[in-house]
Amino acid sequence: MKEARLSRLVACASTVAVLALASGCTMLSVDKRSFYQYDHPSAVEDGSFRRSLDAFGNTMVGGNRVEILNNGDAIFPAMTGAIRDAKVTVNLESYIFKDDKAGAIFADALMAAARRGVEVRVMVDATGSSRSGALLDRMRKAGVKAYVFHPIRLWSLYKIGRRTHRKILVVDGNVSFAGGFCIANQWMGDARNPKEWRDMMVRATGPVSAQMQAIFGEDWTYTTGEILAGDKFYPHIEPAGEILGQGIKVSRGDSSSLAAMFYFVAIESARKSIHIQNAYFVPDAQIRAALIRAAKRGVDVRVMVPGRHIDMPLLRMASRLHYGELLKAGVRILEYNRTMMHNKNAVVDGLFSTVGSINFDARSLLQNNEDSLSFYDRDFGARMEATFAEDEKHCREVTYASWSRRGIEQRIAELLSSFLQPLY
């Protein structure tokens, strides 16, 4: 059986990992952090909750217009269209930028912008875009400033765990995109079949784009030394709408795990509903405890994760290990089975929403550089809820009874996968 073979593979891989850890040869380190204590959390509807969000690095700013972009058929034209309309600057950061049809579409738009005099900067990750050197060279020849974050070299292998998982596009300093979308063929289409992945981006127009520009600038300056400042990067931005928005920056140097703390506070503040969509859902003990407490106080907690089409089956097994305690508490777990679901978004009490690159796993919460755009708006929250409800039509709900019927081999594989998941 395929599952049995996978289980044996996990067992072998676990042995290798344990030996590597024992000999001090592991290439990843997970920073120690405190167990959170958050007494008397404000409800999401309270103004104090919104003001408390400012503690996560950026102040909530108004005057934004936000569009939800579902799947490649909406995302590709929106992002490449913004690049084509650029007049001054284009700054793009992507974990994956493949040298394939999708990559060519973006590269053509970026090169055309550079040729007409727009300053174009591209930052890709060395691991996620490891085979894109020729494509980057073509862009450089056209005038694009293209760099690789943390190139993998023999003498710096100890840094291999430091990755940028961010997905950011900022155009002319006032239009920004964030979400789970990467530049590769599987993100094309409309999630109609397993070859077309399900994903979401948001396009924000307005003052919050300056915060996303600064997040891009952090990795750019770290890699190139160039400081992005002045009017061409931070122009005066007129209000484009009424939505309150906030750019969330997560960096490896953040030993308290801003990403985990951000979600922890939102979960503890929920009074009505928590609807999460996440591609790699392996939350730590305190996030699980927060979700359990929310469900027990009557909050409608639903977590949507990939089903059988997940691209990383070991992560799915690690995720399923902890389903039992969540299901017993009343958390509903929905497996999306139409195709691979790559979303990283949530909406709390229909009012607070977030869309970005952050997964619920150890790498996102402790290792990677990540980003998210968060919004505090009832109408936008309703749009997020509608999107969640539409995706629910393609899900199978996991019950405690079905979860309990797992065989011993699968249970062992899940346990071993959980030990390995920080390395994925």
Per-segment meaning from a language model:
Residues 24-424:
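Charged, low-complexity intrinsically disordered terminal segments
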Residues 1-2, 27:
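Basic/polar N-terminal segments that are highly enriched at the extreme N-terminus
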Residues 2-14:
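Bacterial N-terminal signal peptides that target proteins for export
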Residues 12-22:
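Bacterial N-terminal signal peptides
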